[in-house]
Amino acid sequence: MSNSQWVPVSLNEYLAHLPMSDEQRAELASCTTFAELHERLSAQPVTDPAEAAQASVGRRLTLSADDLEDAEMLGVDASGRLCLKATPPIRRTKVVPEPWRTNILVRGWRRLTGKSNPPKPDHSDLPRDLPKSRWRTVGSIRRYILLILMLGQTIVAGSYMKGILPYQGWSLVSLDEITRQTFVQTALQVLPYALQTSILLLFGILFCWVSAGFWTALMGFLELLTGRDKYRISGASAGNEPIEAGARTALVMPICNEDVPRVFAGLRATFESVAATGNLDRFDFFVLSDTNETDIAVAEQQAWLDVCRETKGFGSIFYRRRRRRVKRKSGNLDDFCRRWGGEYRYMVVLDADSVMSGECLTSLVRLMEATPDAGIIQTAPRASGMDTLYARMQQFATRVYGPLFTAGLHFWQLGESHYWGHNAIIRMKPFIEHCALAPLPGKGAFAGAILSHDFVEAALMRRAGWGVWIAYDLPGSYEELPPNLLDELKRDRRWCHGNLMNFRLFLVKGMHPVHRAVFLTGVMSYLSAPLWFFFLVLSTALLAVNTLMEPTYFLEPRQLYPLWPQWHPERAVALFSTTIVLLFLPKLLSVILIWAKGAKGFGGKFKVTVSMLLEMLFSVLLAPVRMLFHTRFVLAAFLGWAATWNSPQRDDDSTPWLEAVKRHGPQTLLGACWALLVFWLNPSFLWWLAPIVVSLMLSIPVSVISSRTNLGLKARDEKFFLIPEEFEPPQELVSTDQYTHENRWHALKQGFIRAVVDPRQNALACALATSRHRQAQPIEVVRMERVDHALKVGPAKLDNQHRLMLLSDPVALGRLHERVWSEGHEEWLAAWRASIEADPHAPLLPLQPVVKAPEPVLV
């Protein structure tokens, strides 16, 4: 009788999923138990059958990836269990955040009572031989000029606005008369003037905000047109200096439940681009995962192994998944700095969708070396890679208008600029010493871990005496935008809450005035929405007062002449025209700049102009929609409402009609009711409000139609909303697109079930598990309970928290794997088989070992 006639079917099935020769498989088929199989695979005696699967992890790994041994990636932990060297050895550096003192009254009281306040920033780590930079004086002068321009423009516009409003001044309200009349009579008399004053105040704030954007774009236009910016940071380096061996740079990519195929495609494209520069030995790559979805976590493990094997990046590309997700992204970076930050001079932070060229990265290192007082150099990422109509219009807008605003920011701020949290290089030593973030004190929605960490880190870097620059003209930095309006708004809600939190730091001691202004502009980015909304509501209320209240023309006894409400339509037209110019002239200047520099990459002069006009129309339609959403976000933040919004997963990134109705339905209803109210009050006023109410009533179809991929691709085919990165794509983006498609082709589905049952996936998961405790009875009891619970409830009912604990524990995961097979738990085995059958790209069985082609012999 042959062995195949008596060996359990599950054992043959297990062997079929190990890549080995038929001879090896036949030899192992004589095993009578799975414990014996694992013992023979490991080629060492196993004293405890429960630990048999753990003993064979190394052999199962090398059968699937024999280059792990060649790269010396296999190691053992303190308990002698096999592990993968997915991270470098830990060399800890002290990272101590300074507690925030946000209350100026408390600081003043501590000073009066002699209690110590935080010490002044220590600039001893700055290079001593640097002369005082002239750019600091120039920057201060420029910002005073900007302030004068903004305030002067706002005062003139405010005087025009005051002349437009019907009730001129409060002089017609008699205080003596107010004391002799009822409260209702007083309220009715004062109401028009109170409304008018509020409208004037809101107009001044909003006009000043628009004016700041206009002057920023105008100076950016002049900078880019002339090309004579002697303070641009990119001019500090010739661009061909050798990078010294000590200037090591870590590229860190914090991720959390991201699109795994796209993340590792961009990482691979960036890695290969750096390798092409010949400076790969100066860079290390870190994927820092905060993922808490087990299927995604297992897919990340496999993707890391695949990209290391494909690029021969073992020892250069590292992967770590945190078990304790403290302080979100900033905490993830803190953990990296604490463990490995001292080994690197610089750090480049990447987003999950970031791609950077090797030339850009090496240029950033050279700029840091050439500018010893620079703490952060931020690039201007170019948006690309999206196909929906909405995303294509947005990436066209950022590509066409963005350079003006970025160059303008640099003109006004110079070395006291923004940091956007990604696609930037950071000097590690001052970042570790000065930029660790303590949680905000207190309770409520604006306390706790800082959400928008980037602005705060830039402010702390500048407070410590280091420069923060924008390299606005440095090419080779790319990112992706949300595919549709609702995904963008979901991101905006997080940013809104984070920027409102940051404003608590506005009066923190030692902050530079520029970064106090950055906190203020961050708040105004979202607070301007409710201010605009209230401005429109008050304007409608003033219209109602003028329409419904009987005007009083004679306010004093024996008054000879009536006092008529004043209307100056010519001033209204002039003010309206001026506002339109401030809003849309930067877009026209952007297109003029493209005409002057060359419009071929944008589809030609005609196509780029038509694209600009279409984008302007689209922005007009979406501005009121964003206004209402941002108003809701601001109110939600102040009221402490939960900031979660779980949109359904969509493969084509399009918005379903049902979801659009759910999200935009109240806006549509508000727009219709508002239009009816204004029409009833004064039909002629409806023309002024039409852009608002029509946009709200069209929000549902606009949101759905703009999210369609086929419309975006058709627009690209017709060369509308075309950008140079599509007309002549750089190699990094071509590679990213190629690798994304390849990764999606063999992307791992239902990863946790594979990690439990599949012989190869289980070996990888056990080798990468990070919860490596020493032997202890309480831990053993917990492990046994977790394994028993998983076997009892099965994969369908096992919650994500239990899955995470199993995935993090190599011993528990190995025991679960062994018991599923040896005890024949059909629920787990059936789920695993179903996952393989559902995968159209699963390999044929039985698996055969990879045969390496013989290397050519050089003669």
From Swiss-Prot:
Compartment annotation: Cell inner membrane
Enzyme Commission number(s) from the entry: 2.4.1.-
Q: What class of enzyme is it?
A: transferase
MF terms (GO), sorted A to Z: hexosyltransferase activity
Q: What is its main location?
A: membrane
Which GO terms fall under biological process for this protein? glucan biosynthetic process
Q: What keywords appear on the UniProt entry?
A: Cell inner membrane, Cell membrane, Glycosyltransferase, Membrane, Transferase, Transmembrane, Transmembrane helix
Segments crossing the lipid bilayer: 144-166, 200-222, 523-545, 573-595, 608-630, 684-706
The GO cellular component terms are: plasma membrane
The family database entries (Pfam families) matched by this protein are listed as: Glycos_transf_2
Family from the record = Belongs to the glycosyltransferase 2 family. OpgH subfamily.
| Function, as annotated | Involved in the biosynthesis of osmoregulated periplasmic glucans (OPGs).
Q: What is this protein called?
A: Glucans biosynthesis glucosyltransferase H
Gene field: opgH
